[in-house]
Structures are given as structure tokens and as C-alpha cells.
Amino acid sequence: EIRSHRRSKSLRYQYRWGNYWYCMNTIKKNGLRINSTLFDFINKEAIPETNVDPEVFWLKFEEALSELSPLNKKLLDERENIQKKIDAWHIERSDKTINKKEYIKFLKDINYIVEEKDDFVIETSNVDSEISSIAGPQLVVPVDNARYALNAANARWGSFYDALYGTDIIPGKKDHRYDPIRGKKVISYVRNFLENVAPIKNGSWKKISKIIIKENNLIFFIDNNKYYLEDKRQFIGYNGEKEKPSSILIKNNNLHIDIIINEKSVIGKDDDANISDVIIESAVSTIVDNEDSVAAVDAEDKVKCYRNWLGLMKADLKTEVIKDGKKFIRKLNLDRGYIGLDGLKFELRGRALLLNRNVGHLM
């Protein structure tokens, strides 16, 4: 049962589910009936700073709906019709063995399978490197959870030490307090990793006592002797001073490794080369999901999703997090700055490339 009450330019709809009445305020605009929560979000939060007139937006939105909705319905009707034919075909033969040739012919007859076309070439331009040239992990995160979304966006860079220490890759029990023995196992694991991805010619990451930069090369000291990377091109940047860098940046397979040097840190002061952490580039892209991992049904649900996405796009999304009894604000990471071998400063992207996934034509 539905009841409606007119209030100026808005309609207040009430619908009953069981013994409960639910209210839905709507705005009438250009032939559309728009939920007031969504209407206010678009006008007051999404459109400002875009140089788009709200009146023009709603007018063009209505035009797009009027043009595309019939086409969308036609596609869905066609899909439903094909599905009914396939269902009927299988039901009729439920007690028979499927003849493959007969089945393929049937699928072609109903245009489920179409004839293969001539070979062709297609190219796209201006594709982000995270899609076109970098091979790396991709995450999927529900857009309605701000904390999860921020974590995923920030997952492009992370401490290799922390990741290993907190997982069962390193055997043994984990405690809330720092375990130096477990810490040494982590450091050994990372040194082996560096031996593989950025080997030192005739040397070892496990034996270095100092790292400096000279003539655009990394110099590793082992027993007062100098050693270099096997592939000197892997070293592309640093922070700090050449004689005392605070970090060195290495590139491998289009991904980056940031080796942090800090003699005053808990880890670095006990390390022969004062390496305190190794930050690796990992999840280069993230699917921000409006679909499988999210249940966004009504306007309030959807606006929550849209608001989080807007915050990600404007880079101002943040949320309060409580961890180990401590409160802090989680927000998007900044880009990472370095000094290049030419002496000029440059930046690497600090966040994952965000992709928005939705299936509006089905929802």
C-alpha cells in the first residue's frame, strides 16, 4: 500500500511493509521524480567546484535517461528472451545426452553465438601505466566502507617488514610486543628478497655496513670494500644527502622498492647498514565496488557510496579509526617525493589507481 502527500514542490511517499510505514521524500524535476536525499547530495556536494549548473545537469540527465532507457530495456528484454529459449531447450532434453553439434547450432540460431568476424586491430591511447605497463596486484573493496576504501587506496605502498612480521610467512608465535628474534627472521627474509630482485655484484645485502651515493651510483661497503648493483640502472632516486641518504629507490619490473635508512629507529640502530624498513610498491590498482561486495538498495545506501567515492576523487575522504585502544584519523596518502639522479625532484604516485565497478543496467 502506498500513500502520498504533496508538500510544495516535493512529494512525500509512504509505503507499508508488514505493519510498518516507511517514508520517501521525492523532488519533481524535468519529469523525473528524485529522492530528496540524492537530490541534495548531487546539488550540494557533488556538483559544486565542477563549474556545472545544477539546472543544466538535471536537464541533461533527464535527456540521457529518456534516450537510453528504451535501448537499455531492449537489451535486457533480448537477454531475457534468449535465456528463456536456452532454458526451454535444456528442459525439453533433460533426460537426453546433449549433442554438442546440435547445441552449437541452436545457440547460433538464436544469436547467442555469432559468426566470427575478420581479424582487426584496436588501440587505445592515454591509458594509465597501472593498466598498460605495470604488472601488480589489484584489490577489490566495498565503496560503502570508508575505512576499507582508504586502506585499499593506500595499499599501493606498504612496509615489507610489517607485512612479514604480522603474517605466518614467518613461522612462530606473534605477540603484541616486539619480538627481536622474529624481527631478525623478517630482516633475513627481506635481505634474501633484495638478493634476488636487486643483486649486488660479487657482494651480498646481508653483509653491507654502509650505503652512499657517488657519481649517480649506489656504493655498498662490505669490510671497507666497495660494491655496486649488478644492474646499476635499477637505482633511480633517493632522499637525504648523498653521503648519508635517508632512503634509496630501486626499480624492478616497473615496480619500486624504497629502502629506508634511519640509524635512530628501533630497527635501524641495530642494523649494520642502519636499514630500518623496506617499503615496496604493491597493489597498483583497486576496484572500488558498487556491485558484488555492496548491498546498496535505497537512496541512503547509494548516497553513502557516492559520498565515499566523491571523497576518494577529491582526496578528502577520512575516517576515525581505533586500533589498540588509540584513536587516529585515516586519510589518503600523499604522493612520494624523491631526488632523481639528475638532481631534480620527482614524485611517484602514492595511491592505487581507482576503478569504479557497477552494473547500473541490472540494478
Model-derived features: positions:
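Initiator methionine at the very start of the polypeptide chain
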Residues: 1, 22-24
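Hydrophobic alpha-helical signal/anchor motif
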Residues: 13-15
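N-terminal-proximal low-complexity accessory segments that begin disordered
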Residues: 24-93, 97, 101-114
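Catalytic alpha/beta active-site cores
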Residues: 105, 111-363
